[in-house]
């Protein structure tokens, strides 16, 4: 690679724009295990036919992953380092928003249509705005129809937005939380947007005491309507990643390894219907064109102690794994998959990136961020 950034109408050549090797090497050395990636034979072709790529996060490895394929260089897994990456979303403008440790980061694609990085990547997400929030334990994130970032603070049990002056500005508290306080009481985690507004959240319990949710992991989980404060579904095990798709509310019943749909026959509380079992603790869900992209994680302490997932895995004679499964919603079958083996055992969130088949992202504060310079086409008069 060249030491000088060069840009043409078609291609930008940038120095060391893929820190994958260094990140993977550090993880492997620290754990004493090799990291391996595998995928189903049809995954890359499926993404290409859909005109999309995948982004997913692992706070355990400190990595933002982007999976796609180049027409000339084949499948590509680009990995960029980020402090504790958690929830991510792609908004209507195509920008990527990420909750990451003590900050919320807005990435923008800096390439023009037809441009590529190093003849491979057709989108390059640069961290353009970094809001320092402090440690709020940010989880799911979305952007409303006014361009306002809305994210879940598990530590403060609320939906919040960024503030120019303060660490955060609270937006909404669940009705069972009595006060805004820095205690993770119910483990609020998931956020579903609908029509550009916060619509539903998931919580592990309705507990209103510090760490109360830990004793309610099996069966204490709820889905709450943000607009009314109603509990629309309960009895879940550590629910995560609520998402709206074609008028239906889908949720990952993580502690049972289930993709479920919430059914409401009228006003008031509904029920959840399991549609698919996946062998892992489920977090990260994106739905598109009749398919669900589901993130799977292995247990943190060898077993999913106290969760239905342990029994389900034993019953199906299955081992948990880390990766992404593509589920056909019409049949419930897993039609494609991507798997990670080795020291990376946990994912948090994933998103489908439409319109780009081989994206990459730049790590904040990295040499790559310093080297990749772009500018507007003309001076503003």
Regions found by a protein language model. Name each.
Residues 56-59, 91, 97-103, 143, ...:
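Conserved beta-strand positions in repeat-built beta-propeller and related beta-rich domains
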Residues 39-51, 105-115, 201-218, 295-319, ...:
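Short, conserved, GDST-rich strand-edge loop motifs in beta-rich repeat architectures
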Residues 63, 103-105, 158-160, 219-222, ...:
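A short loop-to-beta-strand structural motif that recurs across blades of beta-propeller domains
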Residues 36-50, 82-93, 131-148, 177-199, ...:
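Beta-rich, blade/repeat-based domains predominating
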Residues 73-142, 286:
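Blade-loop segments of beta-propeller domains
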Residues 320-325, 329-381:
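Blade-level signature of beta-propeller repeat domains, shared across WD40, Kelch, NHL, RCC1
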